[in-house]
Amino acid sequence: LRIDKICRTIKERHKYKYNLQAILTDLVYARILSPSSKLASYDYCQTLLEPPKYSLQDVYRSLSVIAEESDFIQSELYKNSNFLYPRNNRILYYDCTNYYFEIEEESDSKRYGKSKENRPNPIVTMGLFMDADGIPLAFDVYPGNQNEQTTLKPLESKILQDFNCSEFIYCSDSGLGSAANRRFNSLGNRAYIITHSLKKMKKEDREIALNP
């Protein structure tokens, strides 16, 4: 995936002395093998064949850089992944979820909203695109009180601009299939498929759906 090249490019734009490639790689390993906090992930990496040569503070410092360069990292990983295996990007799936924080006061993007776990805590919303094989393509994080339907256009616009991906069928559940989102995915060489409840369909439409 040429993560080394990605990290070299990032370092040219930032002033830091730690090894971003080593930190990013170890965080991915830890997330797959033993998902936990950054502190626990750092401790876990100490048990690997090649333990970290960076400090825990370096991990914390790198997080702001990774967050700032998130869009660049995602687009480069997508482009580089095509060298390993051609991505099936003719169909893209989009969905949202949210994450809660065990805090009481709102701050930044952590806002009170409708938690999917029915938690009374501030949350953030994450929107994620996957390709037809279920491999993640791009994601972004939004304020927890933002309507999920409005998260689509900004992220899809990034895909159109940065991923060189403009001919696909957009698929989502009915909750993300607003008129504005359907209209947006009728432009260019895009189309859409939105799930729809049979119970809410008109009788004639339901008969066609059940007997195509």
PLM segments and residue spans:
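Short glycine/serine/threonine-biased micro-segments
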Residues: 111, 125, 132, 142, ...
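Short, flexible loop/turn motifs enriched in small residues
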Residues: 118-124
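Dynamic "connector" segments at or just before major functional cores
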Residues: 1-108, 120, 129-140, 145
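An internal, acidic/charged active-site-proximal segment
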Residues: 148-212
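Generic structural signal for residues positioned in beta-strands
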Residues: 125-127, 191
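Short, solvent-exposed amphipathic alpha-helical segments in soluble enzyme
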Residues: 108-111, 185-187
